[in-house]
Amino acid sequence: MEYKYSTIVDSSKWDPEGLIEGIPLRKHEAGDLEEVGSFRVQEDWRRLVGPVENPFRGSLGPEISFITYTVPECLPERLEAISYGLDYGFLHDDEIDTKIEEAELDDVGAALAQGGSTGKIQEGTKSSGKRKMAAQLLREMMALDPERAMTLAKSWAQGVQHSARRVEEKDWKSLDEYIPFRCMDLGYMHWHGLVTFGCAITVPEEEEEERRTLLEPAVIACLMTNDLFSYEKEKNDNNPQNAVAVIMKIHKCSEEEARDICKQRIRLECRKYARIVKETLARTDISLDLKRYIEIMQYTVSGNWAWSTQCPRYHADAKFNELQMLRAEHGVAKYPARYSLENRKNGANGVNGVNGINGVNGVNGVNGKRKRSGEETADDARTNGNGIKKPAHVLEYRDSLVLEDIVALSLDWNLPDLSDGVVVQPYKYLTSLPSKGFRDQAIDSLNTWLRVPTKTTKMIKDVIKMLHSASLMLDDIEDNSPLRRGKPSTHVIYGNAQTINSATYQYTEATGLAARLPNPTSLRIYLEEVQQLYIGQSYDLYWTHNALCPSIPEYLKMVDQKTGGLFRMLTRLMVSESPARSSILDQTLYPLSHLIGRFFQIRDDYQNLASAEYARQKGYAEDLDEGKYSFTLIHCINTLEAEASLASEKMALRAFLIKRRVDSSLSNESKREVLDIMKKTKSLEYTLGVLRALQAELEKEVDSLEAKFGEENFSLRMMLELLKV
């Protein structure tokens, strides 16, 4: 990776014991911007929330400040914003530690979830100061990089959700039991969002699990470091959530011995991660952004250690430096940033900048490596130039036309197998596109109650992902849709035939995976629901092809079988694989899955016509191009049929629908005319009213289920909050 904004620093002063040996320490050239962000959030907190120590003992240190050393390759124009976000997190975290009942976790979590869903946080005259601060920060970040700003908001919301569990005291039986909880409590999801935003990184969704696995030693090293240095101020708590305390209790040892054990674990995890970084950078089967992410996160480990050795947050006797004290006393308005963004090219439009490209294999050859014109790389001899391996036998036999060679080939039953590299390419392309991951969230939310083992949960997620992705590939062909998530649809790139082949291959893969689920009943459930998916889709296609408007009941039943089918399938599979399945009635979760399916589809219908963001992702009022009978269009047609005064609008709409059938699309001018007719019938308003009513019913259903299971489901409520219109 090219280093543009940082320089190597000798770490021996901060690490005389060599605990982080093998992981370099770097310093950002624009560290002054971190201080500005930190003092700005302190000033805002005092003004909008309440008193706070001055200077606040957060991310700053007299020699080493946190962001400057942990994100040394942050784009300079984003450094102040992520510094603000980090110390906002520290301020909120301290409030949770001292008075959790006043921390407004629900409000902050809901605000961030809303920001992650819509790109903005609604404010009102009665909004809390914390909500106003979060809204302002999100606005600043959206102006720089909307997609990654929303990703940050979602990640942060997940961290706030976890913080709510601190109300419950934990009695840890082992360090291995403590570590997973502490990994989340560390603010890892918040930090993940800040780093990916700051460095303009987007790890493809299909690499998320691998990202978490590769990163695990780094996260453990950081949590052990934090616990090692924070124990002094936490040791007098009734039940400190700290690795040193856990080790002392488990091993019945002294504090000094526990600290030594903690250090040895840090050394071990650092060595693991240094090896992972080296191995990851040598790989050719993962995206460039995952490589960058794993490399960049090593500086979180080294920077966190160096910062922890001298920061006032962990050391009561540590003093801030002179400039920090001046800014604390007089404000950043009087002592502004000394670093000038204008005097430095920021490189934001580079390979992975704000407008960068993060394709599966990059844009200029295998894994994004650029080749000089006419130059052949070592891999070119083994690939077709697009990262797909040539079959081995092509290299061995070449293209011989000698009769004996042809006969020998014809009689050879042991020719090397053809890999699945070609058939999965369209699928890999689709799954590399940005996704909100609602179905994974639904599975995780249900697991709050169902307690399905992690391995089985992952299998169910993969089954649903394969089916959903395959259905999108086929839907786009059937609907002749040119865009998917703001990018060209799969068939536009790979052609209809190859896309259909890839999609049906994924159906067979999903079936094979469903057959390997522990409970044999799961395969039957899977097959039943796949049949329903096809039946539901058949009616959608039938109505479109024949220009037949269904009734509302027919439409809802189609939705139950098509869109709701995947939600129902994942619900039934999770119940089938739950250890508590014997005590759960078959119908317990059916109303929830049906409501989510109907809400999701009607919401999609509404946004297709009313959302500017949806238009950017899929095209302007795309459902009208496809000739689909959406909920809104059905209401419009029914209203026109019932209102004699709208006879001319009825004729006009019918003419537009016939024109769409003949031309296979409508012009934007025609679409605007159709939308004007819908405004006269108030169909969009009606659809929005139905959505809000369904949202209320969903909330009631969650209340009912929480009562039945005896456990609140914050993650499910968060998911529903993200879906609000």
Curated annotation (Swiss-Prot):
Cofactor(s) it depends on: Mg(2+)
Segments carrying motif DDXXD 2: 475-479
Binding positions for isopentenyl diphosphate per the UniProt entry: 436, 439, 468, 485
InterPro entries per the UniProt record, alphabetical: Isoprenoid_synthase_dom_sf, Polyprenyl_synt, Polyprenyl_synt_CS
Binding-site positions, Mg(2+) 4: 475, 479
Motif DDXXD 1: positions: 93-97
Keyword vocabulary terms for this entry: Isoprene biosynthesis, Lyase, Magnesium, Metal-binding, Multifunctional enzyme, Repeat, Transferase
Highest taxon of the lineage: Eukaryota
Catalysed reaction, written as an equation: isopentenyl diphosphate + (2E,6E)-farnesyl diphosphate = (2E,6E,10E)-geranylgeranyl diphosphate + diphosphate; isopentenyl diphosphate + (2E,6E,10E)-geranylgeranyl diphosphate = (2E,6E,10E,14E)-geranylfarnesyl diphosphate + diphosphate; (2E,6E,10E,14E)-geranylfarnesyl diphosphate + H2O = ophiobolin F + diphosphate
Positions of region (Geranylfarnesyl diphosphate synthase): 323-725
SUPFAM superfamilies referenced in this protein's UniProt entry, alphabetically: Terpenoid synthases
Annotated Pfam families: polyprenyl_synt, Terpene_syn_C_2
Record: residues binding Mg(2+) 3: 475, 479
Gene Ontology molecular function: lyase activity; metal ion binding; prenyltransferase activity
Annotated Basic and acidic residues bias: 373-382
Residues that, per the record, bind dimethylallyl diphosphate: 484, 562-563, 601, 608, 618, 628
Biochemical pathway: Secondary metabolite biosynthesis; terpenoid biosynthesis
Metal-binding listed as a keyword: yes
Purpose: Bifunctional sesterterpene synthase that converts isopentenyl diphosphate (IPP) and dimethylallyl diphosphate (DMAPP) into ophiobolin F. The C-terminal prenyltransferase (PT) domain of AcldOS converts isopentenyl diphosphate and dimethylallyl diphosphate into geranylfarnesyl diphosphate (GFPP), whereas the N-terminal terpene cyclase (TC) domain catalyzes the cyclization of GFPP to ophiobolin F.
Notes on the domains: The conserved DDXXD motifs as well as the NSE/DTE motif are important for the catalytic activity, presumably through binding to Mg(2+).
Descriptive protein name: Ophiobolin F synthase
Organism, scientific name: Aspergillus calidoustus
Name of the coding gene: AcldOS
